[in-house]
């Protein structure tokens, strides 16, 4: 049998096919999307979705879809502040993002107060969540409310607000969270009062949080908080949890967005 000699046209076609195959393997949108994950990042008291911008940009650059909902009555939704806002309102805010966006395989992250929020969200949409992350956050048990777990100064401030029927708890300075000096003015300009009665709502938990496959606790070690230290030490002994300590103030997403993004990708 005589072997056919390659023609110039065949050579060009072969080169084109090879380049196309390389492009498909190296930069296929379908391939990139196969590993993309939805991240839902939930802020804590006095904050808003704005505080996640640096982390969201880093995760987005890696091809992930990122949602940073602002809870009712805070941030750009501060005009909705009222005495009717409870913890359940905030749980609904986040659960509805997951429901209405039809999200699955969610990495759900809650900062500080939002440890209550994401624990409640797990009760409503647990099958949609594959990884839950508590970022320097409360880890509540059934029947607890935020007021039960707050440090003495914040406990007193909340009771004073309730006594005066104030719908919003006063804003502390960013310095109180040990935010780095460069970002303190920016954070101060964004903080808004925290809905008072959200701190009084007991949470109802039936164990949905514990059914989530991946569970992580991240402690900001430069922010003194004995309760959070206790969570970390307890969870270090639990093989169902991954734990991290980062040398940051309370607002890790502001102070150390690069390191936080790395951890979130590790535990996704």
Language-model segments: residues:
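N-terminal export signals
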Residues: 2-5, 10-31
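C-terminal segment of N-terminal export signals and the immediately downstream linker at the start
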Residues: 25-44
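Catalytic active-site module of serine/aspartate enzymes centered on a nucleophile-bearing elbow/loop
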Residues: 244-268
